[in-house]
Amino acid sequence: MERYLTKMPIKSKANEVPKKEAFAKKETPKVARKATKTDTPKELKDKENAGDDNTPKQTKGRPGRPAAKRKNLDTPDVKDEKIAMEEENPPKRRSSRLTRSTRSMAEDGSPSPEKEKPEKLPFIKYKGAIKYFTESQDIAASADDVLQWVEKQKDDVVPMAFDMEWPFSFQTGPGKSSVIQICVDEKCCYIYQLTNVKKLPAALVALINHPKVRLHGVNIKNDFRKLARDFPEVTAEPLIEKCVDLGLWCNEVCETGGRWSLERLTNFIAKKAMDKSKKVRMSKWHVIPLDENQLMYAAIDVYIGQVIYRELERREKVKIKNEEEFKEKNGDAAFKAMKTLGETFLTKINEVTL
């Protein structure tokens, strides 16, 4: 028994728990941080000359992309200087108009009349009669009455304001011609709604094609083209040849330029304002009956067209008279020279002495 006891190991060194000191010795030593490199005096001087800053730059956006450069802000002194320069020499803006009137070029660059925006103009008030028809037989009877009135006139030319209305949809585009309005006398306007009309009455076709009738309006040629597309019994070309576009006529008589709308032409010639409500202009012109706002809108369009025609006719007569008197007094050569200069005869003709 003792023999066996002496041979058995009392304590194994392998089973001994190592001391804490042994574990501490086996731990991986921490890596010491590198000391921040200090710039030498020469490097600091180079950075100062280069304008570098030691402040870390903040980047925005994705990593790897350079940060957007910040815009340089002007100092108050620089801003004041720029404002003063702009006030002294304002930037020239290119006009959106295609042409410039000869009147504006002749009068030291002053704006042409069609560009002048009046402060306040009185709105047009139409107090005449409005004759409104929707059925084919009624339209035919009314057109025949106007035709007989035209034939009784002693003048060789009878001006007639002409305009059209139709519905418009942004999905389907323009609809069929729905309304024709005419005016031969400022005291009465005729409105023909074509919704129930499959074919234009012969009396109405005869009226607009009558040799004594001079149809006029703004952008009137396109109206005739559309009318001919919607109603094959109408031929556009004869109507286009004899019609008068009030905008083009105004450019000839008043020596202006550019394209005109009825609203601007009314401001310039009649010195009136038009209530061009988008709600009425884009309304359902094909729906019977038309309401009071639609009837007044349609009547005013042709009424003011007749007023503008009469005024342009008067101005043209005055201009022709002044030009003839100038030719008799100064000769054709002086007249051509004045036309070349672009002077307006209505205001300059009596100031020229040769």
UniProtKB/Swiss-Prot annotation:
<dbReference type="InterPro" id="IPR012337">
    <property type="entry name" value="RNaseH-like_sf"/>
</dbReference>
<protein>
    <recommendedName>
        <fullName>3'-5' exonuclease</fullName>
        <ecNumber>3.1.11.-</ecNumber>
    </recommendedName>
</protein>
<dbReference type="GO" id="GO:0003676">
    <property type="term" value="F:nucleic acid binding"/>
</dbReference>
<feature type="binding site">
    <location>
        <position position="301"/>
    </location>
    <ligand>
        <name>Mg(2+) 1</name>
    </ligand>
</feature>
<dbReference type="GO" id="GO:0005634">
    <property type="term" value="C:nucleus"/>
</dbReference>
<feature type="region of interest" description="Disordered">
    <location>
        <begin position="1"/>
        <end position="120"/>
    </location>
</feature>
<keyword id="KW-0460">Magnesium</keyword>
<keyword id="KW-0540">Nuclease</keyword>
<dbReference type="InterPro" id="IPR051132">
    <property type="entry name" value="3-5_Exonuclease_domain"/>
</dbReference>
<keyword id="KW-0597">Phosphoprotein</keyword>
<dbReference type="GO" id="GO:0045950">
    <property type="term" value="P:negative regulation of mitotic recombination"/>
</dbReference>
<keyword id="KW-0479">Metal-binding</keyword>
<comment type="similarity">
    <text>Belongs to the WRNexo family.</text>
</comment>
<dbReference type="GO" id="GO:0008408">
    <property type="term" value="F:3'-5' exonuclease activity"/>
</dbReference>
<dbReference type="InterPro" id="IPR002562">
    <property type="entry name" value="3'-5'_exonuclease_dom"/>
</dbReference>
<keyword id="KW-0378">Hydrolase</keyword>
<keyword id="KW-0269">Exonuclease</keyword>
<feature type="binding site">
    <location>
        <position position="165"/>
    </location>
    <ligand>
        <name>Mg(2+) 1</name>
    </ligand>
</feature>
<dbReference type="GO" id="GO:0046872">
    <property type="term" value="F:metal ion binding"/>
</dbReference>
<feature type="modified residue" description="Phosphoserine">
    <location>
        <position position="110"/>
    </location>
</feature>
<feature type="modified residue" description="Phosphoserine">
    <location>
        <position position="104"/>
    </location>
</feature>
<feature type="compositionally biased region" description="Basic and acidic residues">
    <location>
        <begin position="13"/>
        <end position="50"/>
    </location>
</feature>
<keyword id="KW-0539">Nucleus</keyword>
<feature type="compositionally biased region" description="Basic and acidic residues">
    <location>
        <begin position="71"/>
        <end position="91"/>
    </location>
</feature>
<comment type="function">
    <text>Has exonuclease activity on both single-stranded and duplex templates bearing overhangs, but not blunt ended duplex DNA, and cleaves in a 3'-5' direction. Essential for the formation of DNA replication focal centers. Has an important role in maintaining genome stability.</text>
</comment>
<feature type="domain" description="3'-5' exonuclease">
    <location>
        <begin position="149"/>
        <end position="314"/>
    </location>
</feature>
<feature type="binding site">
    <location>
        <position position="163"/>
    </location>
    <ligand>
        <name>Mg(2+) 1</name>
    </ligand>
</feature>
<dbReference type="Pfam" id="PF01612">
    <property type="entry name" value="DNA_pol_A_exo1"/>
</dbReference>
<feature type="compositionally biased region" description="Basic residues">
    <location>
        <begin position="59"/>
        <end position="70"/>
    </location>
</feature>
<feature type="modified residue" description="Phosphoserine">
    <location>
        <position position="112"/>
    </location>
</feature>
<dbReference type="GO" id="GO:0006139">
    <property type="term" value="P:nucleobase-containing compound metabolic process"/>
</dbReference>
<feature type="binding site">
    <location>
        <position position="163"/>
    </location>
    <ligand>
        <name>Mg(2+) 2</name>
    </ligand>
</feature>
<dbReference type="InterPro" id="IPR036397">
    <property type="entry name" value="RNaseH_sf"/>
</dbReference>
